[in-house]
Amino acid sequence: MTERKHGLTYADSGVDIDAGNRLVDLIKPMVRATARAGADSEIGGFGGLFDLKAAGFKDPVLVAATDGVGTKIKVAIDAGLHTGIGIDLVAMSVNDLVVQGAEPLFFLDYFACGKLDPEAAAEIVAGVAEACRESGCALIGGETAEMPGLYKDGDYDLAGFSVGAAERGTLLPSKDIAEGDAVIGLASSGVHSNGFSLVRKIVEKSGLPYDAPAPFSPVMTLGGALLAPTKLYVKSCLQAIRDTGAVKGLAHITGGGFTENIPRVLPKHLGVGIDLPRIPVLPVFKWLAEQGEIAELELLRTFNCGIGMVIIVKADAVDQVTESLTASGESVHLLGQVIAAKGEQRVVYDGHLDLAW
């Protein structure tokens, strides 16, 4: 076949296959470092493999989760800070898996952009790989999509997918959650990955650039503080579940805050009473509340406010569970207890958040 001279190429349309190959070469060592029992984390095949038997499971139930990072990505783009976004991507899925009592097994990511910058993309994947290692989760595959015309140069989006497993009969929440059970919370690392459309609106209102010192943490830039990666709760929570046998349920405090997420793990006739002064409100939320003049109930329905994971435990096992979580490096706070639901109100707040700073 005679090749026509000066014919169009895929590169002429804005898609650079060589750049994609360069990215694969950059990330192979990162991906390989996430290998665990059941997965060798070698990429390049048409599908990722996982051997449940090699991972030690006998009668497993699989649990799947998928999520993104939302408009936090826009803050990362505007601030030029990308590594933490990869951590966020993993955390949003694997934290949801541990809520079900499942051990994360493997993760896949999807990266879409207008023009692929291999080095910048590798920075994001480095964060993904770091979070996978910390969660004991193998990165077994992914997709990079260069889509000129759909995304502007410099813009990108991410999605993640993870699968975990638990032995049959050990899934959470348990069916014996009852009035009087204790509600404890694990401290968050910051805003995590929800509410960023409101965050961006508040930053715009403040007039501060992302490279300005953060008013609530002057040793950091505003962008750096807002982009603090979502905390990974996998290892600490799994350890507490296995050590104590007293964990009845968990709620990952994401979009919808306390108000929407805690009821998701409760029987319909039950709710929780939360003592608001016990929530360790982080300075970032105090600043956001002040700058945005955000009502307290709106804060509680939008942000984690300083608590990223809520755990329901047997009332007589609070000390035991707290000891396990503290040994894993968590900051643990007793927030309240399980109560009878009051009609449509499933989360009852007592007192007020400490928003003074």
From Swiss-Prot:
<dbReference type="InterPro" id="IPR004733">
    <property type="entry name" value="PurM_cligase"/>
</dbReference>
<keyword id="KW-0658">Purine biosynthesis</keyword>
<keyword id="KW-0963">Cytoplasm</keyword>
<dbReference type="GO" id="GO:0046084">
    <property type="term" value="P:adenine biosynthetic process"/>
</dbReference>
<dbReference type="GO" id="GO:0006189">
    <property type="term" value="P:'de novo' IMP biosynthetic process"/>
</dbReference>
<dbReference type="GO" id="GO:0005524">
    <property type="term" value="F:ATP binding"/>
</dbReference>
<keyword id="KW-0547">Nucleotide-binding</keyword>
<dbReference type="GO" id="GO:0004641">
    <property type="term" value="F:phosphoribosylformylglycinamidine cyclo-ligase activity"/>
</dbReference>
<dbReference type="InterPro" id="IPR016188">
    <property type="entry name" value="PurM-like_N"/>
</dbReference>
<dbReference type="Pfam" id="PF02769">
    <property type="entry name" value="AIRS_C"/>
</dbReference>
<dbReference type="InterPro" id="IPR010918">
    <property type="entry name" value="PurM-like_C_dom"/>
</dbReference>
<dbReference type="GO" id="GO:0005829">
    <property type="term" value="C:cytosol"/>
</dbReference>
<keyword id="KW-0067">ATP-binding</keyword>
<dbReference type="InterPro" id="IPR036676">
    <property type="entry name" value="PurM-like_C_sf"/>
</dbReference>
<dbReference type="InterPro" id="IPR036921">
    <property type="entry name" value="PurM-like_N_sf"/>
</dbReference>
<dbReference type="Pfam" id="PF00586">
    <property type="entry name" value="AIRS"/>
</dbReference>
<comment type="pathway">
    <text>Purine metabolism; IMP biosynthesis via de novo pathway; 5-amino-1-(5-phospho-D-ribosyl)imidazole from N(2)-formyl-N(1)-(5-phospho-D-ribosyl)glycinamide: step 2/2.</text>
</comment>
<protein>
    <recommendedName>
        <fullName>Phosphoribosylformylglycinamidine cyclo-ligase</fullName>
        <ecNumber>6.3.3.1</ecNumber>
    </recommendedName>
</protein>
<keyword id="KW-0436">Ligase</keyword>
<dbReference type="GO" id="GO:0004637">
    <property type="term" value="F:phosphoribosylamine-glycine ligase activity"/>
</dbReference>
<comment type="similarity">
    <text>Belongs to the AIR synthase family.</text>
</comment>
